[in-house]
């Protein structure tokens, strides 16, 4: 196994450059799945904690009404029923499900990434499509929507020891034993633990350390320049490339053709680009390498204006935060309002009934409370106060409408029943308006799917 430390360092540098994107995606994912009080804040005493802890310290009970998840379900449901139903499908990859989950990732992070390979798996020899998490993907800074400015990309992968041996032993028993020993040493030096079932495996992933019992593999594709000969065969009309060391082979072929009176192959030296793939272990050992005309990844970043990535979820996070704060404020107001407080004058306690018995009988059906009435003084009274109209409900309605306006997902797209008096034409118009608002996202994702299908 050769050493490729320089190429591993280049992959690591590219991975570190994507730290901001991964942190942004993690925040959006948390908001999507309900962890909406996890942003870090600084307390007045200088302590740093998440918003949930800060609100509890201040006496609030943080409330959450997850509207973002509902929006995504509506969009994905529309995609499944109206768009994906007419798409290419196969029995091997279950593309409808893969594409739905990729769309969900696209809405959350603004990134849609898949890997298409032709290989043998448990399902047989086929062209396989795999979802690649942006948390495991690395790529140089790109600004071209078509990906023509990509120079390095790849992913970090976790494989079982058996899979590593199967993929990289190349039919050599000694190499298989060397691979087992190599990764056994790496596992002994690591300190990663297993991930609980149902928990995220990518939230705090590192570049070099694999989960317990797994082997970390870094797959890196670099665009390199290579010397080649551009050839033209007059006999067949084919134009093709030969390796840079094929000059003698071409000359010998032409000598043979000259003796037979056949047209000679025309060739000239040229420089071209090819993708150099390397599978590396965390210590820089090269497990396998190959050259290819194209890399196996298909990706789409949205909207990629000046290279920036912004997702659908990012647009509605602020409205979601406002809704949560209003719900928390309303809960605080209601919890601090007097609700059935009993005012019992101290000088009216009955000798034969304690204050505890009086409180219990007051709340009991058909209860009897004894007290000593005082001339000119009111008896025990129950106080119920109303918090009053502070405008919280109106502000909450405003934020809910703003979420519809910002996201473009209205009641018609959600499948909600039409309100009383609404005509069918108006309801259909609202549905079409929602679809038009999301057409840019659907269009961007459709170009991604088309590019993927061309690789199948």
Language model regions located:
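Extended, helix-rich architectural segments
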Residues: 1-270, 274-275, 282, 387-398
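Short coil/turn segments at secondary-structure boundaries
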Residues: 97-106, 116-120, 334-346, 413-420
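His/Asp/Glu-rich acidic catalytic environments and adjacent acidic regulatory segments
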Residues: 316
């Amino acid at each position: 196994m050769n050493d490729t430390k320089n190429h591993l360092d280049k992959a690591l540098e590219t991975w570190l450059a994507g730290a901001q994107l991964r942190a942004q995606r993690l925040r959006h994912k948390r908001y999507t799945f309900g962890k909406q009080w996890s942003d870090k804040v600084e307390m007045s005493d200088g302590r740093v904690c998440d918003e949930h802890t800060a609100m509890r310290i201040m006496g609030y009970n943080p409330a959450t009404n997850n509207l973002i998840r509902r929006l995504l379900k509506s969009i994905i449901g529309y995609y499944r029923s109206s768009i994906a139903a007419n798409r290419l499908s196969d029995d091997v990859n279950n593309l409808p499900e893969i594409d739905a989950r990729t769309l969900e990732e696209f809405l959350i992070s603004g990134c849609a990434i898949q890997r298409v390979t032709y290989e043998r798996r448990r399902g047989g020899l086929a062209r396989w499509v795999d979802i690649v998490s942006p948390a495991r993907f690395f790529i140089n800074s790109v600004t071209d929507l078509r990906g023509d400015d990509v120079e390095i990309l790849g992913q970090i992968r976790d494989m079982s020891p058996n899979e590593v041996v199967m993929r990289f032993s190349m039919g050599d028993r000694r190499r298989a034993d060397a691979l087992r020993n190599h990764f056994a040493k790496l596992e002994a030096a690591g300190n990663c633990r297993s991930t609980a079932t149902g928990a995220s495996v990518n939230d705090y992933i590192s570049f070099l350390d694999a989960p317990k019992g797994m082997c970390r593999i870094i797959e890196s594709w670099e665009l390199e320049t290579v010397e080649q000969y551009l050839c033209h065969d007059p006999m067949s009309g084919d134009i093709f490339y030969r390796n840079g060391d094929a000059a003698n082979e071409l000359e010998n072929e032409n000598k043979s053709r000259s003796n037979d009176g056949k047209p000679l192959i025309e060739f000239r030296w040229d420089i071209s680009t090819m993708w150099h793939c390397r599978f590396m272990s965390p210590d820089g050992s090269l497990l396998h390498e190959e050259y290819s005309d194209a890399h196996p990844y298909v990706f789409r970043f949205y909207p990629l204006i000046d290279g920036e990535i912004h997702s659908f979820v990012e647009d509605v996070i602020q409205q979601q935060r406002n809704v949560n704060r209003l719900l928390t404020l309303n809960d605080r107001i209601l919890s601090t309002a007097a609700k059935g407080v009993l005012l019992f004058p101290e000088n009216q306690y009955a000798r034969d009934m304690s204050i505890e018995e009086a409180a219990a009988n007051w709340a009991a059906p058909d209860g009897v409370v004894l007290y000593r009435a005082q001339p000119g003084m009111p008896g025990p009274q129950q106080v119920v106060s109303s918090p009053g109209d502070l405008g919280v409900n109106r502000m909450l309605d405003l934020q809910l409408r703003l979420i519809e306006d910002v996201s473009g997902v209205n009641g018609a797209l959600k499948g909600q029943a039409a309100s009383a008096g609404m005509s069918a034409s108006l309801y259909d118009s609202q549905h079409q308006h929602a679809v038009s608002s999301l057409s840019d996202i659907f269009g961007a994702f459709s170009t991604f799917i088309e590019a993927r299908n061309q690789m199948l």
